[in-house]
Amino acid sequence: MIHKYDYHKTHFLFSTSCIKNLLYNVSKEIAFTGSSNVGKSSVINTLTNQKNLARTSKKPGSTKTVNVFEVEPGVNLIDLPGYGYVTMPVALKYHWQHDLIYFLQKCTNLKGLVVLMDIRHPMKFLDKYIIQCAIENKIQVFILLNKADKMNAYACNTQYHTVQQHLSNLESNIKITLFSSVTKLGIKKLKAQLDSWFSIVS
């Protein structure tokens, strides 16, 4: 049976600069990831109906720590640092990418991975790589094509089918939805997916 969670009650739990610290959690977890400046913080704020729960910035790569938010006791959302930002120091960039892959391989409490993409520039190399790693580690993936308000309906539909085509060769049933923090497009589908994942009995 799928439980309906009240994401409006979500609150900040803790931050860590070491993603491996999450491996010691016993809570159910769903992680949000994506390239820098894709709008992860805005999506989390829209989901929880809280303007400042996750800090937003116009400067790409601002989230340099892992931020954990508690929906209710034992149920967490994880905001992972953006990957691939071009001006990030190379050593730091590869450190985070390595730790993210390690997290996907080792985290036993991860119920699903929400991969955000800017609908104007979807399926970058690192997006594909992260999705493939998730599939290999039997982690369910949900793709949000974010910033859909930046394009007209026809262009959004074209990008949607382009992403579908990219995923057609993968042996996994990955769901995709258009999303906008401005118009709230896709918010019901996002909540339904999170509810479904959190309701999975281990």
Curated annotation (Swiss-Prot):
Residues 26-200 form the EngB-type G domain. PROSITE patterns: G_ENGB (PS51706). GO terms for biological process: division septum assembly. CDD domains: YihA_EngB. It holds the Pfam family MMR_HSR1. GO terms for molecular function: GTP binding; metal ion binding. GTP binds at residues 34-41, 61-65, 79-82, 146-149, 179-181. Keywords: Cell cycle, Cell division, GTP-binding, Magnesium, Metal-binding, Nucleotide-binding, Septation. Mg(2+) binds at residues 41, 63. Its cofactor is Mg(2+). GO terms for cellular component: cytosol. InterPro entries: G_ENGB_dom, GTP-bd, GTP-bd_ribosome_bio_YsxC, P-loop_NTPase. Belongs to the TRAFAC class TrmE-Era-EngA-EngB-Septin-like GTPase superfamily. EngB GTPase family. Necessary for normal cell division and for the maintenance of normal septation. This is Probable GTP-binding protein EngB.
